[in-house]
Amino acid sequence: MNTTKKLMTMLLVMLAITAGHAQDATERSISVEALGVHNIVGINFDSRFRGNHGIGFRVGVGYAQGKGKHIYFSPSGTKTQGVAFPIEINYLLGKKEQKLELGLGASLGYYGERMEFGIIGGHQYMPVTEKKFGYFVFGNIGYRLQTNSGLMIRIGWAPSINFDDGGCHYLQRRLLSSLYISVGWRL
């Protein structure tokens, strides 16, 4: 079984386990996140297994976009955009409104990569678009303010690493780092 299939199987099992526990959760929230694992913008559902602290999970959907350079094949660069689905297991430390958030997860995505060709060696090349599956794993270290009135604000850092993405150039960077900000509301 290749790495992609193993990762997909592991994520589906994690999602099934967390969905079963979600029925007992006492704290749930929905939020809009800029940057971070979504790259541009995304929507997240977050839930604790008990109370408003300890272990929980987050699932989301987001829009990703990026630009890159291909020195040999596309001197004009590449443009990548697509949809991503991050899944994270996280832990909240703290007793009141202010908490430290720690998490690990993976983001699965389907991306369209457009290579903008130009003139190379006197020959003109046309743009090429490829659709590709890509994924990366990420960590999460953040500050979470969750007020008694229901407002939730998250600010943090989500470093990510890609191991093998099947050639999706947007995701081929080995060490990605991204700050994020998120605003949400308790459900």
Regions found by a protein language model. Name each.
Residues 1-26, 183:
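Bacterial Sec-dependent N-terminal signal peptides
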Residues 11-12, 64, 150, 160:
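A periodicity- and composition-biased signal for non-globular, repetitive helical segments
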Residues 20, 35-37, 60-64, 105-109, ...:
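Outer-membrane beta-barrel pore domains and translocons
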Residues 26, 37, 81, 133-135, ...:
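Residue-level preference for beta-strand/loop junctions
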Residues 29-44, 51-53, 61-67, 96, ...:
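Solvent-exposed loop/turn segments connecting transmembrane beta-strands
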Residues 44-151, 155:
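Gram-negative (and chloroplast) outer-membrane scaffold detector with strong preference
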Residues 114-122, 157-168, 173:
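A short, hydrophobic/aromatic-rich structural module that often spans a beta strand
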Residues 175-187:
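Outer-membrane beta-barrel "beta-signal"
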